[in-house]
Regions:
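A short pre-motif secondary-structure segment
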Residues: 93-94
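N-terminal interaction/assembly modules
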Residues: 1-85
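Short, locally clustered residues in the helix-turn-helix/winged-helix DNA-binding domain
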Residues: 84, 98-99, 133
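DNA major-groove recognition helices of helix-turn-helix
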Residues: 121-135
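Helix-turn-helix DNA-binding module
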Residues: 100-117
Length: 136
C-alpha cells in the first residue's frame, strides 16, 4: 500500500506532482518543529507575535527569526487542522502515517494496534492529502 495514489476515478484524486507535493509537505512537519525550537533558542523571537513583527527589509535578526517562526507555525497549523478534520477520531495514527511515514502494517502490528482496516486507512490518508493540497 505504500506510495499508492488514488486512481483518477476517486473523488480524492490528485495529479502525481500535486500528490507528491502534499506528501512532502506533510513529512516536513517534524523538521519544522525542530527548526522552531532552534530559532527560539538562538534569539528572543519567542516574545514576538504576528501583530508586533515588522516586515521591513532592514529588520534585525530577531525580527527575521520571529517572522520565520510565525511562517513555520502557520504551516504546522495547516497540517494539524487537516488531520483533525479528516481523521475521524484517529488523530494519533493518521499523524504517524502522514507526518512520520508509518505504513499500515507498522501501525497495525507492534505497539500501535490501530483499529482501522486497510481500506478505511487508505481512504483517510488520500482524503488528508487532497484536503491539505487545497489548503496550501
Amino acid at each position: 500500500m505504500r506510495g499508492r495514489r488514488p486512481s483518477e476515478k476517486s473523488k480524492y484524486y490528485l495529479p502525481p506532482r500535486q500528490y507528491c507535493y502534499a506528501v512532502s509537505y506533510a513529512l516536513m512537519r517534524d523538521e519544522w518543529e525542530a527548526e522552531i525550537k532552534s530559532l527560539e533558542n538562538q534569539s528572543r523571537a519567542i516574545r514576538y507575535d504576528i501583530d508586533k513583527v515588522q516586515t521591513s527589509l532592514s529588520g534585525d535578526i530577531t525580527e527575521k527569526a520571529a517572522i520565520e517562526i510565525i511562517d513555520l507555525r502557520s504551516k504546522i497549523e495547516k497540517i494539524d487542522s487537516t488531520i483533525s478534520e479528516v481523521s475521524e477520531g484517529q488523530d494519533n495514527y493518521i499523524k504517524l502515517a502522514v507526518c512520520n511515514g508509518f505504513t499500515f502494517t507498522q501501525l497495525t502490528s507492534g505497539r500501535y494496534r490501530m483499529p482501522l482496516n486497510c481500506n478505511k486507512f487508505g481512504m483517510i490518508k488520500h482524503r488528508f492529502y487532497f484536503e491539505l493540497f487545497h489548503k496550501i
